[in-house]
Curated annotation (Swiss-Prot):
Main subcellular location: membrane
Similarity remark: Belongs to the UPF0257 family.
Membrane protein topology class: Lipid-anchor
Protein name from the UniProt record: UPF0257 lipoprotein YnfC
Compartments it resides in: Cell membrane
Organism: Escherichia coli O7:K1 (strain IAI39 / ExPEC)
Amino acid sequence: MKYKLLPCLLAIFLTGCDRTEVTLSFTPEMASFSNEFDFDPLRGPVKDFTQTLMDEQGEVTKRVSGTLSEEGCFDSLELLDLENNTVVALVLDANYYRDAQTLEKRVRLQGKCQLAELPSAGVSWETDDNGFVIKASSKQMQMEYRYDDQGYPLGKTTKSNDKTLSVSATPSTDPIKKLDYTAVTLLNNQRVGNVKQSCEYDSHANPVDCQLIIVDEGVKPAVERVYTIKNTIDYY
């Protein structure tokens, strides 16, 4: 039996060990930014990425692009949301993210490169002892975020005036397929929507192709929309 192993061991020795080491945890910055800017969080030594959401006709409805340092800080982040007519482009400058066009200071940071304050909207963020954003608050609303032991976002609860909106996500039990999940949305404890996502993954356990099904249960009959998500990811 030992002799049968020798050719395999020799091959490994000659070719080197180039297997990708899979990182199962999410950094506080990646998890928290994904919550605030509404994209799927990624794992491992991500250098840059583009995440594109397309409808059933193949039309782009949303695109998020980011570049990260080797330490995991977002050097730049760009969000294009065609459905909500929103464009955001931020670049890192010391303790702030500036508008990429006007260079106006938009987001103040705390710690290494975590969200702290959005002065123009009067929003401030709080973190836990591990650096994850767990609360966001302003005069109009309060938000609380939840994560699992690997830092995967499990949802959030938003309270504003007399309304409470809660999103609860349940990821796959397979730690490699964390972005295979279901989620339920409640408005004042009444179910108004659900989501199901399934993906194909790369060697870093990050999604490359996903199908996202969103069901709006707040209307009768319920309306189902099917989206495709494409990820292009470069690593260090």
